[in-house]
Regions:
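Non-catalytic alpha-helical scaffolds and adjoining flexible linkers that form interface surfaces
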Residues: 1-21, 25-216
Length: 216
């Protein structure tokens, strides 16, 4: 059995002295794991977390771990490594993908959003880009946030609150009786973290430490 796609290398774990078990977020097949031969000893084009490239995965049976062939096209993480704050955002995104996405289920839209995030993490727009990426992650996992209109009356102005139950915006008038129960807009990482906690609880996992360390 052979699968081919493009992907982002999001994890490497040593396997013996030469090989590694790689985790790749592919556009067509989602998160996949497999053995990457010679990953630890390669002197040219050494596999590194944060690379994007072409991958093929081979196994006799679909249930097997299988092996990867990986051709890196670009190391997206290189410009990020010099900034501790941007590196923290990268680590959080990788860990969230690893923990929350089921293996071998395609999330093509989120894959594209992740590529956009990797590009943006090397710029001054990294914080906003990361917040937008978390919103995309929540949406693709079935927890879409709707900030377009008030969930109570349909108003499109004065949307300064968010319902923790529905993830929908609430205008000032409708929010008045429930101020203490609502999240304040605009969105911050503190608010998206609360929704991510719900997702993690539903999946029986905990929010990654790298995500908990991010500041608001």
């Amino acid at each position: 059995m052979k699968l081919e796609s493009v992907g982002i290398l999001i994890g490497l774990r040593p396997m013996g002295e030469r090989d590694s078990v790689a985790r790749i977020f592919s556009r067509d097949f989602g998160v996949m794991c497999g053995v990457l031969r010679g990953a630890q000893t390669a002197r040219v084009n050494r596999p590194l977390v944060g690379q994007i490239g072409a991958m093929s995965w081979n196994a006799r049976l679909e249930s097997q771990l299988g092996t990867f062939h990986w051709e890196s096209a670009r190391n997206m993480a290189a410009p990020i490594m010099m900034s501790g704050a941007r590196l923290a955002l990268l680590n959080s995104a990788i860990d969230l993908v690893t923990v929350l996405l089921p293996e071998r289920e395609a999330y093509a839209h989120l894959y594209d959003e992740t590529l956009n995030l990797l590009d943006a993490l090397g710029t001054d727009n990294s914080g906003v880009a990361y917040l937008n990426w978390e919103i995309a992650l929540l949406r693709d996992l079935g927890y879409a946030l709707d900030l377009s209109h008030c969930s109570g009356c349909g108003a499109r102005t004065n949307l300064n609150y968010l319902s923790p139950r529905t993830g929908r915006a609430v205008c000032d008038n409708c929010a008045a009786p429930y101020i203490g129960r609502l999240y304040k807009l605009p969105l911050t990482l503190d608010v998206t973290a609360r929704f991510l906690d719900v997702v993690c609880a539903d999946q029986g996992v905990t929010l990654p430490v790298s995500r908990r360390r991010l500041t608001v």
